[in-house]
């Protein structure tokens, strides 16, 4: 039998349709400099949650729950109760009792294996590292070289596609034959077709796969290289935003399929490698989850019910009584869960302050290009495409040109030095000649005496130069600026009763030596600080011409009202406010009160966070605690500068009066919404199709990174090595590209800080309004009806229980 002899005939249209379906199931991962939280299961939302959970268990050995011990511990500590287990059992229609359910939990965390591939059968026949590791490593190195556009000084030939580059690299790599103990490997590589589509066809035909096996087989192949598959999906996502497409994911699938053909020993007798694989493959395909797996899924649902019960108890208490004194200021935060404790503390420190929640990009569909650079970055959710351009300006175009040229020269000098550092001849002589000069800085950074270089968009600026600049929109007609401002204010439910001061707070994080730092910044700003958006909107709303136009739209901002912008540092809970012009005497007094309240609120939140960060000894000493946090965020060795969005579990869109004073433990996204000001339901539609979806992405990234960090997370942060300058990270020196969150972002070394619960969305709106949005949008319908999140309704009567939308319609929540 020759190498290219067809083993089985198959319909090519069916084959390529199955390949397309497999590729469409892969969700994108964003690069490090735009690292946003993404659900790795986003493209599977057209299936039910339970169905996807079972598929992942069968195909990849992945689960969407914690292990049994975690749920036993939750019961022992009182976070979970028998009544929650019973509610979960009743909901599933199970005849088990809570005692039987607990008895069925696995005694130990068994290693699930998923569907076997041919490489697994061949693994035992070669020495370490083994075929699966060797294949993943080889594909990873090839993809890293192919996609690199920023780090390597040498890159492979890109005149053709990824598959062709991989095939050419394989032909040149003689070490593979040695590592695999397969002398004929190079000959087999030469027999591979030149085109990826043909390689897929040949692999399927030679391995004897039937049409009804292709969906599972292709899915298994891509799940083995999920990191690079997700990067290819990102390239496809970006191309489609521009009306184009990208086929690198199909080519990666062809590479994976070709490897299966390469490890085939070409024998077909009983006991051969192929025969053993076919037997194991068919047996695994017919396997159903054991009772222990079902018990884990029920425990996870019980924990969600326990959380919803706790949430309902807080929301059903008497509503907060508004302060009798006039409103001093209104402070708008991003809906990020880290803003909830600061909002609560701020309102407690100064009851005359009211807080609001809105997506941190503040409704501005912008892309930002820092002055003096060509590095444009999106400042809006990954779901959307930018429509407006923003840069920095001093207000004087001539001065802007001078500043831009000055910065470009500084950046060019720095780039030339970095190029010299990378030269092969510099590897030893550079250290010998200049190493001692770095000693002071090295010791200073190690001891926390020196801070890092700061935010990238401030690089190569002197402090005075940076202070002279502020974000500025590219020329835009006044009518367009008015319409933009009006849309944002209506979405914020901010169209009347304006206080003297309005403060728009973006947020950003601070850490050192952290490739995934953007993952701690504002997800609504595509992994960037929200400073640009906040300052831009404040400037827009303070513009006299825009205010006049808003008045014609029925939104009258009083002359005495001033809009300010600021930045919430989520790592230290310090708040910086940007004041570009002098305030009037009346506003200055209000500002001083607000500033004092912000400082007091920050101190209180730091005190509350101290224990989780291991700083309990200085929790009651505000200055020492702040100093410790500042040192912590500048510490090169700190793997947990902050906990990010760990613990997120809920999303509430309601008037602030419904949540004011409720301790939501920093676990809830809070979005201001008043359905009485939303006559046509457009604001609710926007909330359910944008912020709610973004919150779901965040929630699922944290959930999957916790339940299966090996596949959906990025492993040990200490071992991270950056790939391609900004693409992502390897754990160690190779393997698959790692996606998701590092274990240190979810686990404190003793226990999980994040509990994997699907998002509970609470909307304060009539049923009919909610149902209209669900009916109009397939994405929302998939999330709600397939169980990817839980949808609940908050009644205007605070004493009424929450209503949950389930298969039988809206039903009152127990508890």
UniProtKB/Swiss-Prot annotation:
Pfam families according to UniProt: DabA
Binding site for Zn(2+): 334, 336, 507, 522
Disulfides per UniProt: none
Membrane topology: Peripheral membrane protein
GO molecular function, one term: zinc ion binding
Record field: transmembrane: none
Subcellular location, record wording: Cell inner membrane
Keywords: Cell inner membrane, Cell membrane, Membrane, Metal-binding, Transport, Zinc
Superkingdom assignment: Bacteria
One GO cellular component term noted in the UniProt record for this chain: plasma membrane
Cofactor: Zn(2+)
Family as reported in the entry's similarity comment: Belongs to the inorganic carbon transporter (TC 9.A.2) DabA family.
Subunit-level organization: Forms a complex with DabB.
PANTHER family the record matches: INORGANIC CARBON TRANSPORTER SUBUNIT DABA-RELATED, UPF0753 PROTEIN AQ_863
Protein name: Probable inorganic carbon transporter subunit DabA
Gene: dabA
